[in-house]
């Protein structure tokens, strides 16, 4: 499993619009091959900052499958105009996975 981590700085004053747009756009990733789960969290200290966590089966499911798809173009159209600056996206793999 691969965890995509994106820190999203949304233009001030557009937080509510972004959340609404994300609520609509999230169906785009949920239907992608290799998608496992996602969550969007809002920062308590910086009200315009969010973190998007998406779990994919493989790195390529995100970087090739999703980003190379027509669905990614729709995702961009719906969400990218909210960001300033453009988000840095990194990918992580578990070193010590959670235990039951």
What are these regions (language model features)?
Residues 2, 39-46, 76-100:
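Glycine-rich beta-strand-turn "strand-cap" elements at beta-sheet edges
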Residues 2-9, 39-67, 92:
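Short, well-ordered beta-strand segments in beta-rich or mixed alpha/beta enzyme
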Residues 9-19:
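Short, surface-exposed ligand-recognition loops at beta-strand->loop->(often short) alpha-helix junctions
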Residues 14-15, 26-29, 40-42:
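Intrinsically disordered, low-complexity segments enriched in polar/charged residues with Gly/Pro
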Residues 16, 60-62, 97:
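Residue-level signal for secondary-structure boundary sites
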Residues 24-36, 55-90:
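An amphipathic, aromatic/His-enriched active-site/gating alpha helix that lines ligand/cofactor pockets
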């Amino acid at each position: 499993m691969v965890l995509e981590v994106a820190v999203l700085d949304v233009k001030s004053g557009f937080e509510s619009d972004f959340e609404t747009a994300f609520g609509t756009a999230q169906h785009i990733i949920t239907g992608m091959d290799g998608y496992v789960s996602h969550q969007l969290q809002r920062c308590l200290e910086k009200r315009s900052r969010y973190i998007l966590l998406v779990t994919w089966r493989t790195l390529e499911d995100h970087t090739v499958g999703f980003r190379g798809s027509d669905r990614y173009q729709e995702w961009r159209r719906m969400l990218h105009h909210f960001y300033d600056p453009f988000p840095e996206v990194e990918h992580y793999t578990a070193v010590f996975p959670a235990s039951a």
